[in-house]
């Protein structure tokens, strides 16, 4: 293994890179990886990064992410990069993107919102990406970046 390699290479699975330092735990919670599932989970935290200063990396062996999971990651790590690995090689690499409309991922923090009492799927529209600000489709409550993680 090369001297500069600090985290093991995975044979198959997903690597989520450029997660802001300290947010790896929220990423694995979003993906439901806090419980043992038989796969290997590798985490590098507070790694030097030219892009972010410091970053976290999460490697999930034997698992590929759904579009919904990638969208959730984009909400807490908008500069993250997802790498798909097969036979120890990166076969696909893409940046996460926040969609214009977010459906069924977040819950509205407004206790009076119809989405918290009726059988309707929560929907949010992106008001701004930098800083991230979302607006509920039903009650028009605005959610700021710091409120998103607690409403996933």
Swiss-Prot record:
Pfam families (alphabetical): PyrI, PyrI_C
Domain of life, per lineage: Archaea
Cofactor binding note of this UniProt entry: Binds 1 zinc ion per subunit.
Cofactor: Zn(2+)
GO molecular function ontology, one term from the record: metal ion binding
Residues noted as binding Zn(2+) in the record, renumbered to the chain: 108, 113, 136, 139
GO biological process: 'de novo' pyrimidine nucleobase biosynthetic process; pyrimidine nucleotide biosynthetic process
Stored InterPro entries: Asp_carbamoyltransf_reg_N, Asp_carbamoylTrfase_reg, Asp_carbamoyltrfase_reg_C, Asp_carbatrfase_reg_C_sf, Asp_carbatrfase_reg_N_sf
Entry's Gene Ontology cellular component terms: aspartate carbamoyltransferase complex
Keywords, in A-Z order: Metal-binding, Pyrimidine biosynthesis, Zinc
Annotated PANTHER family: ASPARTATE CARBAMOYLTRANSFERASE REGULATORY CHAIN
NCBIfam families: ATCase_reg (TIGR00240)
Biological function: Involved in allosteric regulation of aspartate carbamoyltransferase.
Oligomer status and interactors: Contains catalytic and regulatory chains.
Protein family: Belongs to the PyrI family.
Full protein name: Aspartate carbamoyltransferase regulatory chain
Protein species of origin: Thermococcus kodakarensis (strain ATCC BAA-918 / JCM 12380 / KOD1)
Organism ancestry: Archaea, Methanobacteriati, Methanobacteriota, Thermococci, Thermococcales
């Amino acid at each position: 293994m090369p001297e500069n390699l600090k985290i093991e290479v995975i044979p198959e699975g997903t690597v989520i890179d450029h997660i802001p330092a300290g947010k790896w735990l929220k990423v694995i919670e979003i993906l439901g990886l806090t419980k043992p599932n038989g796969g290997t989970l590798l985490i590098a935290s507070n790694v030097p990064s030219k892009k972010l200063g410091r970053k976290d990396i999460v490697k999930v062996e034997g698992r590929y992410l759904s579009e919904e999971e990638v969208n959730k990651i984009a909400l807490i790590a908008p500069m993250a990069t997802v790498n798909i690995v097969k036979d120890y090689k990166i076969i696909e690499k893409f940046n996460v993107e926040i969609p214009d409309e977010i459906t069924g991922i977040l819950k509205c923090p407004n206790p009076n919102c119809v989405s918290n009492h009726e059988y309707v799927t929560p929907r949010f529209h992106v008001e701004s990406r930098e800083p991230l600000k979302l607006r509920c489709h039903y009650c028009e409550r605005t959610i700021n970046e710091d409120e998103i993680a607690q409403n996933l």
